[in-house]
């Protein structure tokens, strides 16, 4: 629906993507009026005297995690309503960015330890099924119980119990790559072709980019349950927030999604892609035998 809205109302923001041979949503450089840097905004919020309770809570959260994780302010940024300045002090959440693979690993380890401490004001948002309780469940191939289990162990979704405001504030620690970790594949990929729908059992062989968007999992397919018979599926790539940090190295997973052939300058391979489009709620990557 979002794609159709942009195509109808803002066609100038539809850019041709050569490997896909179709237009996608994007912004051309000459249409950019302003760029807002998450790390600069956060630095200003932290260095200034807090003007409201949400800023004070943000400063408190950063102080707690930095003291335990031995990270610096430079490793963080802020996004969402705090970045753009339209937050509500009494109702908005705290959306933080953590830059870099090593720092993400460090913050996850730190949060895990804080969650175990009964005296910590930071708790795991998914220590129970409360975040999804009573909501309509649309995903077809992952149950609410399975979803909560996966979310809980990611640790990046927290709740801060603020004594001053008496609020339980949701806090997200969004993993983002450092500039030096980013590799642009656009020039290397010649063509991406949709081959059909696939269901497979696989083993995660590499998960170093599973924390980011898109999430990339290098896999070895153990069994192709349904779909085109190919023998060179190398990775699962997910553009869906629900499936970031979903599986770790050496874990066995069930995957269902779009099979794509990727042709590069050096050869070709197949990938399973979880993305926005038809059969959205049938897509999944989940760990097997986790309970």
Residue ranges and their predicted role:
Residues 1-91, 99-291:
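Catalytic core of pol beta-like nucleotidyltransferases
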